[in-house]
Regions:
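Terminal and domain-boundary accessory regions
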Residues: 1-128
Length: 128
């Protein structure tokens, strides 16, 4: 319906979320799991950044990306964003964080960024 060929979600594998993982797979997402570690506070960390960038670069070089949508607020992805812009492959960044909390490094790339909080309000208005 939306013309999406492939939608990845990179995340740490936490067994108690197996029902969510199944739901996402049934919805058509390709899940890429990373072994988790726990920080000093007991918080699970998946550290998927390098895996995401590696897969994105592989897909780009193998011609599997026409237009990319990246969901992030993390400036660590700014080199990937710049690469996609140079290749005319970036559609938009969807930021889960507000404008104020989204990384300045992403903003400096010149990419179009839509903030999910803003989109939520638009969707709520449309559903009424």
């Amino acid at each position: 319906e939306l013309g999406v060929d492939r939608a990845y979600i990179f995340l740490g594998l936490i067994p108690k979320f197996k029902d969510l993982y199944r739901f996402l797979q049934e919805a058509g997402f390709t899940l890429v799991f990373k072994e988790i570690i726990y920080d000093g506070d007991g918080k699970a960390k998946g550290n998927c950044d390098a895996d995401l960038v590696t897969q994105a670069m592989r897909d780009s070089y193998e011609g599997r990306i026409k237009r990319a949508v990246l969901v992030t607020s993390d400036g660590d992805y700014s080199p990937l964003v710049k690469f996609w812009i140079e290749k005319s492959q970036l559609e938009i960044i969807l930021s889960p964080a507000s404008h104020e909390k989204c990384s300045v490094l992403l903003k400096r790339t010149g990419a179009s960024i839509a903030y999910l909080n803003d989109q939520k309000r638009i969707l709520e208005i449309q559903s009424k």
